[in-house]
């Protein structure tokens, strides 16, 4: 990997961003797994405050156009809009999520040689044996985090485990007031910073560290999303989830001993924190993610 030029200090600033009018109300998503708790109540109480996602959307939309000017078909609004339309047709109903997918220029987060595939619903390699997730998976997981929120209410504070190239973090910044993202692979952390720099996302903080430990200094989080699959969800992350908050993660499914097949598969797991000691778990569809690992490299 070639040396990278000096970069501005991260985390990125949260202020000095011009706002625009709030996005149109989305249609209702899937029913909430449990009743809204304190995390959602806190979000509703702040509805009338300036919205960081709207500020981020203004910043990202304007800078995406500038960063991709003259870039041809893959740089056009039409390519992003067409992707959002396909996701809507496939079952994604959260208009806020669809608008975010239609705003973030995915081709800026992939290798130039793969730019022609950036707006296909496909996972693509980003180096270091990691991938950028399929847009449909990104949209589905974020939509699950937003269940139970009103149409114009952002998620309060999100923790992402596995920044990768930074694409999902950029999408999250348009649906949440604050986003904290952790990456354990130093070159990917630097790559994400470089990818996000042209967009100057105001409500996103990137951290280099062990994602399995979470980010206790910024906890609690109203939502946590994992971009890698472990045998189970790390206890540290459960402890950092706010009461009433949601965590979405791919987890391994090991077949019972003595069964006909011993292939380990993965499925999405939605966890809601009901109170200090109780969690509600819902197993969802099959997925395939890179493995969740501890430590930093």
Swiss-Prot record:
Alphabetized Pfam families for the sequence: PCMT
Q: EC number(s) of the enzyme? A: 2.1.1.77
Which reaction(s) does the protein catalyse, per the Swiss-Prot or TrEMBL entry? [protein]-L-isoaspartate + S-adenosyl-L-methionine = [protein]-L-isoaspartate alpha-methyl ester + S-adenosyl-L-homocysteine
* UniProt KW keywords: Cytoplasm, Methyltransferase, S-adenosyl-L-methionine, Transferase
**Superkingdom of origin organism:** Bacteria
Q: Supply one GO CC term from the record.
A: cytoplasm
TM spans, by residue? none
Annotated compartments: Cytoplasm
Residues of the region (Disordered) are 20-57
InterPro entries in the record: PCMT (IPR000682), SAM-dependent_MTases_sf (IPR029063)
Task: List the biased-composition ranges (Low complexity).
Answer: 28-43
Q: Which GO terms describe its biological process?
A: methylation; protein modification process; protein repair
Q: Which residues carry out catalysis?
A: 133
What PROSITE patterns does this protein's entry cite?
A: PCMT
Gene Ontology MF annotations? protein-L-isoaspartate (D-aspartate) O-methyltransferase activity
Q: Which HAMAP family match?
A: PIMT (MF_00090)
What's this protein's family per the entry?
Answer: Belongs to the methyltransferase superfamily. L-isoaspartyl/D-aspartyl protein methyltransferase family.
Write out the function statement from the record: Catalyzes the methyl esterification of L-isoaspartyl residues in peptides and proteins that result from spontaneous decomposition of normal L-aspartyl and L-asparaginyl residues. It plays a role in the repair and/or degradation of damaged proteins.
Protein's name according to its UniProt entry: Protein-L-isoaspartate O-methyltransferase
